[in-house]
C-alpha cells in the first residue's frame, strides 16, 4: 500500500512540474512581402520543412534560439540546402529566391 501511495505522490509532483514548466522558445524564419521588410509577414517556426509562401520574398529574418535552419531553392526542402543558418540574421531586406526552409529541432 505504501508503494502505491509513493507512486501516486510522485505522479502528482511530476504533473505539477510539467504544468508549471514554460515551453522553450524556438528559432524561427520570417519573410516579408516587400518591398524589403515591409507589408505582410509570414513566420515559420515548426520543426522540419516549411514551404515559404510565394507572396513573401521581399525580405527575411532568422532568429536563432538554439535550432539551426537551412534554406532551399526548391519546394519541400528537396536537394541541397543553399544557405544554412546557425546564428541570427537581422532583417535582410532584399529579395530572396528560397522556396522552403528546414528548422532542425
From Swiss-Prot:
Disulfide linkage = 37-93, 47-105, 49-77
Q: Do you know which Pfam families this protein is assigned to?
A: MiAMP1
Q: Which GO terms describe its cellular component?
A: extracellular region
Q: Which domain of life is it from?
A: Eukaryota
Keyword list, A-Z:
Antimicrobial, Cell wall, Disulfide bond, Plant defense, Secreted, Signal
Induction line: By wounding and by methyl jasmonate.
Q: What processes in GO biological process is this protein linked to? A: defense response; negative regulation of growth
Identify the tissues in which this protein is expressed.
Detected at higher levels in needles and twigs from canker-resistant seedlings than in needles from canker-susceptible plants. During summer, detected on cankered, healthy and marginal bark. During winter, detected at lower levels in cankered bark and bark from the canker margin than in healthy bark (at protein level).
Signal sequence annotation: 1-26
Fetch the InterPro entries from UniProt: Antimic/Inh_G_crystallin-like, Antimicrobial_MiAMP1, G_crystallin-like
Location in or out of the cell: Secreted; Secreted, Cell wall
TM spans (from-to): none
Q: What does this protein do?
A: Antimicrobial peptide.
The name this protein goes by in its record? Antimicrobial peptide 1
Organism per entry? Pinus monticola (Western white pine)
Amino acid at each position: 500500500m505504501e508503494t502505491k501511495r509513493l507512486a501516486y505522490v510522485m505522479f502528482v509532483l511530476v504533473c505539477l512540474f510539467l504544468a508549471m514548466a514554460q515551453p522553450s522558445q524556438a528559432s524561427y524564419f520570417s519573410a516579408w512581402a516587400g518591398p524589403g521588410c515591409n507589408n505582410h509577414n509570414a513566420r515559420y517556426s515548426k520543426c522540419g520543412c516549411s514551404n515559404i509562401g510565394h507572396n513573401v520574398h521581399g525580405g527575411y529574418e532568422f532568429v536563432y534560439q538554439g535550432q539551426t535552419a537551412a534554406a532551399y531553392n526548391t519546394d519541400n526542402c528537396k536537394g541541397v540546402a543553399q544557405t544554412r543558418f546557425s546564428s541570427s540574421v537581422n532583417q535582410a531586406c532584399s529579395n530572396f529566391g528560397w522556396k522552403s526552409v528546414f528548422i532542425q529541432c
